């Protein structure tokens, strides 16, 4: 079974590019990362930074998660991210996404030993 840390990497990490390469980025990434297999995942964020830099956020600014849990951390610096949001015309299995490039602080939930990101909570 895929670990929570591995799932985070599959769903949110794209260290190989510094930003979204084209407007098709989200359509392609959501499909290739299996985020449209049994439904269209409505929203997803990819982070264009090294895994080490994202894992380091687990020791940065301690903040509350959206659900009120306390295991979330906000990055001290802004990171290059791409937000993928399902469009109005998107219909499974033909999932369609709007690609939005941004530089923002990320908020992740961390757990385990080693203490690593397992959930992408928000960007601010």
Curated annotation (Swiss-Prot):
Q: Which PROSITE patterns match?
A: RNASE_PANCREATIC
Q: Which GO terms describe its cellular component?
A: extracellular region
Q: Is Disulfide bond among the key words of this record?
A: yes
The organism's taxonomy opens as: Eukaryota, Metazoa, Chordata, Craniata, Vertebrata
GO MF, any single term: ribonuclease A activity
Q: List the disulfide bonds.
A: 26-84, 40-95, 58-110, 65-72
Tell me which SMART domains the record gives.
RNAse_Pc
What this protein is called in its record is Ribonuclease pancreatic
Gene name for this UniProt entry: RNASE1
């Amino acid at each position: 079974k895929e670990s929570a840390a591995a799932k985070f990497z599959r769903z949110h990490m794209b260290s190989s590019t510094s930003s979204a390469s084209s407007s098709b980025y989200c359509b392609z990434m959501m499909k290739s990362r299996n985020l449209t297999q049994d439904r269209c995942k409505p929203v997803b964020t990819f982070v264009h930074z090294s895994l080490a830099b994202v894992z380091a956020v687990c020791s940065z600014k301690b903040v509350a998660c959206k659900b009120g849990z306390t295991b979330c951390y906000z990055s001290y610096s802004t990171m290059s991210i791409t937000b993928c949001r399902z469009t109005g015309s998107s219909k499974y299995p033909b999932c369609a996404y709007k690609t939005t490039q941004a530089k923002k602080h990320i908020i992740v939930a961390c757990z385990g030993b080693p203490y690593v990101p397992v959930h992408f909570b928000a960007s601010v």
